[in-house]
Amino acid sequence: MTTRREFIKRSAAVTAACTAGISLSGEASNVITDSEYTRLKWSKAPCRFCGTGCSVNVAVKDNQVVATHGDIQSEVNRGLNCVKGYFLSKIMYGKDRLTQPLLRKKNGEYHKDGDFTPVTWDEAFDVMAKQFKKTLKEKGPTAVGMFGSGQWTVWEGYAAVKLYKAGFRSNNIDPNARHCMASAVAGFMRTFGIDEPMGCYDDIEHADAFVLWGSNMAEMHPILWTRVTDRRLSHPHVKVAVLSTFQHRCFDLADLPIIFTPQADLAILNYIARYIIEKDMVNWDFVNKHVRFKVGAADIGYGLRPEHQLELAAANASNPGGAKDSSFEEYKNFLQQYDAQFVSKLSGASKEKLDQLAELYANPKTRVTSFWTMGFNQHTRGVWCNNLVYNLHLLTGKISSPGNSPFSLTGQPSACGTAREVGTFAHRLPADMVVTNPKHPEFAEKTWKIPPGVIPDKPGYHAVLQNRKLRDGELNAYWVQVNNNVQAAPNMLEETLPGYRNPNNFIVVSEAYPTVTSQAADLILPAAMWVEKEGAYGNAERRTQFWRQLVSAPGEAKSDLWQIMEFSKRFTTDEVWPEEILSKSPEFKGKSLFDVLFANNSVNKYSIEEIDPNYKNHESEHFGFYVQKGLFEEYAIFGRGHGHDLAEFDRYHEARGLRWPVVDGKETLWRFREGSDPYVKKGAGYQFYGHSDGKAIIFALPYEPPAESPDQDYPYWLVTGRVLEHWHSGSMTQRVPELYLAVPDALVYMHPDDARKLGVRRGDEIKVVSRRGEMRSRVETRGRNKPPVGLVFVPWFDASQLINKCTLDATDPISKQTDFKKCAVKLIKV
């Protein structure tokens, strides 16, 4: 009998053989795969797509990626890939790849309304620097900004933070992870005082029950879903509960399927907490030692413009994250309003199902892993949802041990490793440091060897606020990297696109392909992709993974890191730092930002001789030192000794990733637990050391309605999201023929009864209309997604069907993350 491992190895051999043009005869295990004969060079790399962090083996021939397959040595995916992963070799080779800078010109000069014209990198940076310098001189650092990405490599994000927060003295840098993970970050920080999951993927093989909250793992984290499926089908006692506002592929495995009314998850979470207390299932030993209670501020608004009526009416819009100390008795009394009658009516879920769900958490013999993604995080009360699910695990002590894990899954390949850990948010610095804590900028300034007071102490503009400031003409020089925000942002016609085309603004977009966002830019810079550069990502289980540059980028395309560092040469400290700082530190006068930030005897201290001679490294060859190693080792200073310890740089090129904190060469699987986490003191058992008292916080937080609900004029809920075959805005996956043919267009998934009521059938054209905009698509009443009556689901990958014309730019007031899951629309037959 062929074992699973043998099957995977033979499949890999088939891939290699077919790529090399070898015909197969007999068993695949006999195929010649020696690089001497196939001329294929195989190397490891993390997948370019989601936050699972699968490892793949990449085959290169004649400076082109020709094949990939799942890495059987990877602890994450164990040789498997999802359908996107299987076609990684094709994402870089679309026919319309951008290969040279393009500047809008009219009569040979830059003009906002000009046509895109090829220019040299020197001319591109000359014009770009002129616009940035003009803005800095006339309006100061708050008028320049950057929108980055959870797809940045670790060192790209780190270099961007240095350029903006230290170089330009502007905290107006934010990642697109604001749209996907900001509520998770705030949830961790409020409950535990430190970011990122305490568990790891090993929890899957230990859990007795899985509860999915707003997470379609079958399509968004399919490799993890295969592990959940294997656990469920191999162990009959294991149960799977799936909660969602519509039915999707995860329901195929669900023992307990629950479809609930949008926003009612808040009430369901409080009902479960009440059930645990009423049934006397509280783990008192754990709670008494490791937990304290707080009441969070309520009536906090919806993150809309301050003049919006909902913001004016909110009692605590100015202090949404406020909280005061409380007690268990007060918490118990608070929960009394969430009885079965109230919650069942509000949510649409029966008492029987609610009790079955609550029993999974309450039963002390059941190890529970909770998974959630955008259903929780893209929510006007997303931080509360995160806090409330932690409540359940803390009340029962089901946390930080194998199989007991509240697990926030990440959507992007380095939303954790770059956006969160590096601190590319407008309020953060590396290793959970923030600009508002005077000690943290001081630490950063010493580490970066720059004068005191350079880093501003006020948070910059978050993602949605950046769009508003662009529209209002208060943010004027703007750089976008590794995202497609005009297509991705909410309420794009009213709040996003106008700012990009504001005649007072200069917009730069670094991109690999033409996108909706690049078409709205003034300057397009061609970007290197994935293995065209040396990189590092950090996945959802705190695993940091490296890869080498395997091929060269086409034409004049350059990595985002090269662009950031090279652009920094165009500025001197005299142009960006005030005289009051330079007069106290005259040794910095006249120096370029490149010299100050990157040639600082820290970043540039590693020789290019340390680079593996078997691989190229374009940035290091250009700048004359091992850029990636220098940036990483300087960045790692922030986390070492602060609970975010990273291993030495070279070790990551040898390993299939390591889960931080890495102390004395050993990775950490379960944080906060004695014997697993080196930061937990002996005898403590558990220690939530993000808070000074070592305790986690249980929050009393109420149900509050969404910012917009269906009414007589707009009677349907609109939910947006993704599909298995496409990544985010589709700019890569729609250029892979197999993925495009599988799902060429977005569709409006709706209930057959709603279709009959509207007089439409499957395949008919329909308009989706909100108070903000409209788009045309076609009806789908069958297939993978099955909404309940009164709700439609529309994916956002399709640039020809911009569903974000319709969405509302409401955000969680604490995290500033957008709610893409709830707004009201009407449907019109075309």
Curated annotation (Swiss-Prot):
This is Periplasmic nitrate reductase. GO terms for molecular function: 4 iron, 4 sulfur cluster binding; electron transfer activity; iron ion binding; molybdenum ion binding; molybdopterin cofactor binding; nitrate reductase (cytochrome) activity. Substrate binds at residue 796. NCBIfam families: NAPA, PRK13532.1, TAT_signal_seq. Belongs to the prokaryotic molybdopterin-containing oxidoreductase family. NasA/NapA/NarB subfamily. Residues 40-96 form the 4Fe-4S Mo/W bis-MGD-type domain. Its EC number is 1.9.6.1. Catalytic subunit of the periplasmic nitrate reductase complex NapAB. Receives electrons from NapB and catalyzes the reduction of nitrate to nitrite. GO terms for cellular component: membrane; nitrate reductase complex; periplasmic space. Keywords: 4Fe-4S, Electron transport, Iron, Iron-sulfur, Metal-binding, Molybdenum, Nitrate assimilation, Oxidoreductase, Periplasm, Signal, Transport. It catalyses: 2 Fe(II)-[cytochrome] + nitrate + 2 H(+) = 2 Fe(III)-[cytochrome] + nitrite + H2O. GO terms for biological process: cellular respiration; Mo-molybdopterin cofactor biosynthetic process; nitrate assimilation. The gene is napA. Predicted to be exported by the Tat system. The position of the signal peptide cleavage has not been experimentally proven. [4Fe-4S] cluster binds at residues 47, 50, 54, 82. Binds 1 [4Fe-4S] cluster. Binds 1 molybdenum-bis(molybdopterin guanine dinucleotide) (Mo-bis-MGD) cofactor per subunit. InterPro entries: Asp_de-COase-like_dom_sf (IPR009010), CT_Nitrate-R-NapA-like (IPR041957), MoPterin_dinucl-bd_dom (IPR006657), Mopterin_OxRdtase (IPR006656), Mopterin_OxRdtase_4Fe-4S_dom (IPR006963), MopterinOxRdtase_cofactor_BS (IPR027467), Periplasm_NO3_reductase_lsu (IPR010051), Prok_molybdopt-oxidoreductase (IPR050123). It is found in: Periplasm. It holds the Pfam family Molydop_binding. Mo-bis(molybdopterin guanine dinucleotide) binds at residues 84, 151, 176, 180, 213-220, 244-248, 374, 378, 484, 510-511, 533, 560, 720-729, 804, 821. It comes from the Bacteria. Its cofactor is [4Fe-4S] cluster; Mo-bis(molybdopterin guanine dinucleotide). Its main location: periplasm. The keyword 4Fe-4S applies. It is an enzyme of class 1 (oxidoreductase).
